[in-house]
Every structure is written in structure tokens, then in C-alpha cells.
Amino acid sequence: MIYENETHPPQVPRYHVTPDGAEIAIGQASFPKPFHIGLQYASPARGHWTIAHSPMLIPGCHEIYVCCACCLHGVVLSADEVPDGAGRFSMVTLTNENLIKGNLEEMMIDGISHIIDDMPERPKCVEGFTSCMQHFLHIDLHVVYDTLRQKYPDIDFIDGYMIPTLQRRFTPDILGRRQLVRAVQPLPKQKAVNYVVNYYPVDEDNELTVMLRQGGYAIHDFAACKTYEEYKAMGESQANIYFLENAGPAAKDMEKRLDQQALYLPYAYDYETLRRNLQQAAQILGLDLPDCDAYERAVEEKVRALKERVGDTHIAIDYTATPRPLGLAKFLLIHGFNVYAVYLDAISPDEKDTFQFLQTHYPDLSLRSTMHFKRRLLPRDDSRKYGKVLAIGQMAAYFTDTKYFVNLIENSGLYGYVGLLKLLDWIGRADEAENPKMRDIIQIKAWGCHG
């Protein structure tokens, strides 16, 4: 029998979706949440890192997830996609039987012990992850980790958390960064500082690093540690310098545990903040200031030359490229560049003044949600609409469908005046030629992560 739908196959429904709710001019936007995010869309631009990737920055650390099978699917795939990542990842499945019996502590101790005993080489550090279910049932993690530390005194254990439904105080990213430095213990103080907690090593050419080295300081960069001994050496530092707002709880936790001063020198694109960062570091750490005027003249010279090349090309920026997307937009706009869209879902408190400036002086700047459910259906055709779009960030490249893009993730180690100069060079190179591998690049999870 031939059915009706075989002779007349149903047509694929065509939807007409308006951008209302998913896009808004900054002049009409509210701070700090310009969008109501309910049902969320996840784009295939996946270069940003997650809690499955960041523990791999600790040399010799082995991740063990003790979770329900449904929760494990995502992290298993994330770890397996990373080069050599699967070898540093294990799992213990939480079952209904464990929930009914209430033996959560016993199964976690036995499961982690079994994995450690079967490993060909004993890890120096283990980060064990618990999920929401254990915490709903009040698992006693003190019993778990005290037992494991007594059983394996040669291993440092970190309590990791995959509890997105229990975000009472910290987001998963903030909590994950804090736990990454929990295995660092006090050591006799040396003339040294730490950079915490970035996912990319800080570029050594930047003026802050030069200042510190000229002042006789050793620098322990969390993301640049090659051995577990280098990671543990962070315990000897006098101060923790952090550039990301999300790294604040990690630095303050180390201040409390290790008696190391927390020093916030944020990423920035305005000269006032860049100069203030250096002045603060110089005052607290006893350093000589570099010639900030010379750096600012160099930036102005480079940005003028870049503007002549880029012209009125449409530019879009996204929040995965930089923690200060509005700050970067402001810098480019006041220098005459045609920034027309910024992709973000919320606005950092650090960018409140920048948000208000853009509201007043550039009210037509489009803010676009990356997670709003409409983003799945809205057209991604800006590169055809405007002729050419230059994207800064992977999500901006995907949503505008352009191959002219700067592959930047969380500033990619760029910092300060020197970082801004290098970013301008990257923008210039991206404007010169298409990257034919754009779609392949943006689908690689945790860009730059290696097991």
C-alpha cells in the first residue's frame, strides 16, 4: 500500500522568526541582563573551555567523575575530543541502587580507589567530581576525601563539582577555577608572583611581565606549568595576580589559605585602566613604571594604520573572545571602526561604565544573545547582507557566517598595551584574507587544550 505522505511528502515547515527578545539596541537594553534567557540554544562554536578541560592544565592530574550516566555523556565526549584527553579521564557511575542504599560515600571511595589501583602509573593529583544528586542527598565529602588521603598519602586530592542546578554562590566556571588551585600548599616565601587562573599562558612580551622580571620577581603562570612541581611552586609566591573577574574567588581563596595578596589587574582596552593597572602593580610590588605615554603613542599609530586598511568594514565581537567585549567595542568605535554588533548574554559588572557610555554615544549598537532559543532559527547571513564582516571571536564568526575572523578565546594570553598592539595586528591579518577552515576550527572544543 502506498500512503499519502509517500506520494505527496510533507513540506518542511518554514518559520518566520523575528529577532525580538534575542537582539536589542544597546540604547534600549537593561543592565546587567539585556535578555530573558529561558530555553537555551547551544551553538556549534565550541572553542571555549569547560570543567572537563580545565583540570588538564594541572600537570599529572587525573579527573574522576562520580555521576549519573545521563550527566556523564557530555563530559565523556568533551574529554575524548581533546588530544590525549581520554587517558586522563575516568568515571564512576552513580546508580539507582546507590541512591536507594544510601552508600554514596562508600561507592565513591571504592570507585576512585579501584581506578587508582588499576592505573599503570600513580597520578600525582586526582580531582574527583560529584554531581547534583550526591549533594541533594547530603553526601559527606569530608569522609570521602579524608579516607582517600589516608589511603593514598602520595596523591593530592581536589574536590571538584559538577552541580549546575545548585548555583547558590558561584557559577560552574568560577567554582571550577577556584578548585584548580586547591592542591597548592604553603611554602617558604620567595620573591615570586602567580598568574591565576587563566586557560592560556600569559604572553611574556607584555609590559607587566617585563616589569616584574626587571624587578627581580619569578613568575608562576598557572596555565604555563609544565610539571606538577611547577604547579606546586605557586605556594612560594607573595601575590596572586588575576586578570579575569571569574578568577577572583580563586585568588582570594589563596590569599586566605596561603597568605598571598590578591591583586586584580583586569583586562582592559582603555588607557586609563591599562595605566592604573601598572601603577597599582608598581606601588604594591615595588616596581618601576614603564613609559605608558610611549605605549599609548604606539597604539594610536597602529590603530590609525589599521583603520586605513579596514575602512568601514562591518565588525562583530563576541564574549568568548574577550571578557570585555563592550570595552573592545568602545575602543574600536571611538577610533572610527564600524562595530555594529556584540554577541553576549549578560554584562559583567566591570563593564557597567562602558555599557552606559555606549548607551549614550552609540545607542544603535546591536546586542545579540548567543543562547536565546530564537538564535537557532534566526538567519546567519550578515556576511551576505553587508558584503563583508570581520568577526572577533568564534561565535561572532559563526553567527555572521564570515571567514574573516580573529580566532581569539578568552584573550588568548594577550594582556596590556602589548596585548592590544598584538590584537590590532591579528585584526589586520584577519581582514586581509578569509580563513577557509573557519567552520572546522570553531567546532574544536576547548581550543588549544591538550591532555
Residue spans of the language-model regions?
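An N-terminal assembly and electron-transfer interface module characteristic of large anaerobic redox
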Residues: 1-451
